């Protein structure tokens, strides 16, 4: 497959030319490292792009550091997340603000290789719903990091590829590119940790959308404490690991399954990449509930139509 790195420019809302790539970076207490991460990204990405850094609070020193950068870099935005604290909510909010058709999620701690942002985006532009930077494919590797976490991640990734044909050997790595239209279609359910990567990989697998990968070399952070919490976030990872196995689902069936698990009263936020503007808290609760209700209703109608057609064929 030939990858084009210079596709025609997209036109966004209001007639403005949209960037080719939206880079989303969740950041918390990364003031000492975010500057180097931004330097590497802007030096590596030659295509039109926007970089969206999402923090939990303006009190985080990361906010001041990125704001100073943004004063001289028009492609950079620093936003305070409105969906709650934590990396999952920061990623969801950042993707909702993305103007490009491809969103690439990367970390602020310099563990990811920004030279791979454009190749990942090219895979999405060529039809993949999810493109993963894989530590466990040929040519990839992981340098440093907790041994237990690495073993679990490697086991999960390789078993999903072998048994579920997930499309990548590294479903758990957060360094991925996504089609924003695909995310609008399936939504994001994760609300804590970094489970979004495996969630969207599993959803793509179940609705039979393409998942692609390229090898990557992942470097453990040189300083500071990682925000990754293996035991606390394990249930979320296990949920999406198991979800990857199963029959093909339509987008409506997928939405109906998510609706059965939804708790809008506790999580009043619309799905990631909802194309409607951000609304007050109460309005967002209604939109979230309505989205799931409509999807579930559509699925019930389709099921009834299928049963009716089957009964008609039997009678004939």
Language-model features, listed with the residues they occupy:
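Hydrophobic helical membrane-anchoring modules
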Residues: 1-21, 26, 39, 165, ...
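Donor nucleotide-sugar binding loop of glycosyltransferases
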Residues: 30-33, 58, 87, 113
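Acidic helix N-cap motif at the loop->helix transition within catalytic regions
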Residues: 32-36, 60-68
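Short, acidic, metal-binding catalytic loop of nucleotide-sugar glycosyltransferases
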Residues: 39-48
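Short beta-strand/loop segment that forms part of the nucleotide-sugar
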Residues: 48-58, 79-81
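A conserved acidic beta->alpha catalytic loop
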Residues: 55-64, 110
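Acceptor/aglycone-binding surface of glycosyltransferases and processive sugar-polymer synthases
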Residues: 79-97, 102-105, 114-194, 221-231, ...
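Residue-level signature of catalytic and energy-coupling elements of molecular machines
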Residues: 94, 109, 179, 204, ...
